[in-house]
Amino acid sequence: MSFDGFFLHHIVEELRSELVNGRIQKINQPFEQELVLQIRSNRQSHRLLLSAHPVFGRIQLTQTTFENPAQPSTFIMVLRKYLQGALIESIEQVENDRIVEMTVSNKNEIGDHIQATLIIEIMGKHSNILLVDKSSHKILEVIKHVGFSQNSYRTLLPGSTYIAPPSTESLNPFTIKDEKLFEILQTQELTAKNLQSLFQGLGRDTANELERILVSEKLSAFRNFFNQETKPCLTETSFSPVPFANQAGEPFANLSDLLDTYYKNKAERDRVKQQASELIRRVENELQKNRHKLKKQEKELLATDNAEEFRQKGELLTTFLHQVPNDQDQVILDNYYTNQPIMIALDKALTPNQNAQRYFKRYQKLKEAVKYLTDLIEETKATILYLESVETVLNQAGLEEIAEIREELIQTGFIRRRQREKIQKRKKLEQYLASDGKTIIYVGRNNLQNEELTFKMARKEELWFHAKDIPGSHVVISGNLDPSDAVKTDAAELAAYFSQGRLSNLVQVDMIEVKKLNKPTGGKPGFVTYTGQKTLRVTPDSKKIASMKKS
């Protein structure tokens, strides 16, 4: 079910009973299109979430906690000016549309009484949140600015007069008079599609359910449907404020708890996508630059292949110095390396010995270039490997991991810290319980955690796991120095799951004691080398991994 006007009617009733006469204590904007108000009401603190997201737009109380940006937006600064300490006078739905108006009162800087309306319009990609002066109807601020060039019907900019979205001819099913309703029910075709055009705020699921019940005693069936008590119901794919037929779902105490559960993974994945998009773009750009650099370096190294030829020519000129003429641009000598004659180019301005030294200098220069380029190539390859590991964890990260990965990229110099951006606190390492019911397995979810786990936490005798030859997490069996094969398999499956091979049917995983790992000098976080490992072959299983998670 969509967040339609029918659902909104029920949740507005819920919010009204909880929040009216409460005071707004804090206002934050954890994400670009979402707003959270902390409200004190009925001796309790509530968090009110307003979302103008194009897919997950909604209004609800939430138990979810959010990390707020260090630098508040202009929108938040204006809202704090007008709403901090404000009293909530009313919360109303506009007809049965997906628009909610919350009227608040407060005092300005000189103590005068002011009223404002916080409006949320839940309209797909056109969703918005606005603060409007109650008396003048002027927009004080809006979360998404919409100019005349974007919408000729109404301009949504600070200072503009607020104009509501265009209304339709459809009727409010909650307030329609019996006479008009009776006429419609008797004369109109009561299909779901037609019901949606006749009445405001009916999503597809609501209209389908209404069509199903309007078979006999239509007037009373209609009234009962819209007057029934709220009984939130959640299925795997949808939610409703009341149970619908053929919909075996989980009941909830209130609509806000239902929405928290329904949107938790969906909204978090989208937030992760939003937060990670900048980092992914940066990492992809750096990968592209370094791959291009590697090709160039390898091409330059290939050009040094004739270094040995210069050395041999210098040796031959030195050996047969008495046969080398002056004032000639070439000489043919016996090549004792190949037992074939060889023609050697000469500089007529130089003596035979100087020509020999010229070839030795060329050889030495190329030899130094080979070492320099070989070192550069190894460094570039290590950077590419590191960035690929960051890309892998970004694609598997949750919100907390994203913040840590950003901190990692700041520390490694790939991005700059924003002004006033705080240093991110290190998240605790994830723990998993092995199949023996007692062994703890630690997993690093980014390179800083990998570094900490492998070189600070793990004991030298403990077993360490990593997906073979692909980016992934470091995994350590903690405490158990003689784990069973089943526990080793558990750890290998964790290493496979938290790697680039997560979706593969079979992943090779290296297993080795921590003491055999080597950290190269100057190596990037999480980079290790090793030899003498054993390799296991496992299949990642997401359900098993989820069941093992301890914290």
From Swiss-Prot:
Instruction: Name the keywords, alphabetized.
Output: Cytoplasm, Protein biosynthesis, RNA-binding, rRNA-binding, Secreted, tRNA-binding, Virulence
Q: What is the reported phenotype of gene knockout?
A: About 50% reduction of binding to immobilized human fibronectin, greatly reduced mortality in mice (tested with encapsulated strain D39).
Biological process (GO) annotations held by this record are:
rescue of stalled ribosome
GO CC term, one of those recorded: RQC complex
Q: Does the keyword Membrane apply?
A: no
InterPro entries per the UniProt record, alphabetical? NFACT_RNA-bd, RQC_Subunit_NEMF, RqcH_bacterial
Q: Where in the cell is it found?
A: Secreted, Capsule; Cell surface; Cytoplasm
Task: Name the domain of life this protein comes from.
Answer: Bacteria
Q: Which GO terms describe its molecular function?
A: ribosomal large subunit binding; rRNA binding; tRNA binding
Protein family: Belongs to the NEMF family.
PANTHER family given in the database record: NUCLEAR EXPORT MEDIATOR FACTOR NEMF, RIBOSOME QUALITY CONTROL COMPLEX SUBUNIT NEMF
Its annotated function is as follows:
Key component of the ribosome quality control system (RQC), a ribosome-associated complex that mediates the extraction of incompletely synthesized nascent chains from stalled ribosomes and their subsequent degradation. RqcH recruits Ala-charged tRNA, and with RqcP directs the elongation of stalled nascent chains on 50S ribosomal subunits, leading to non-templated C-terminal alanine extensions (Ala tail). The Ala tail promotes nascent chain degradation. May add between 1 and at least 8 Ala residues. Binds to stalled 50S ribosomal subunits.
Quote the subunit structure annotation. Associates with stalled 50S ribosomal subunits, binds to RqcP. Interacts with human fibronectin.
Tell me the protein's name. Rqc2 homolog RqcH
Source species, please?
Answer: Streptococcus pneumoniae serotype 2 (strain D39 / NCTC 7466)
Q: What is the lineage of its organism?
A: Bacteria, Bacillati, Bacillota, Bacilli, Lactobacillales
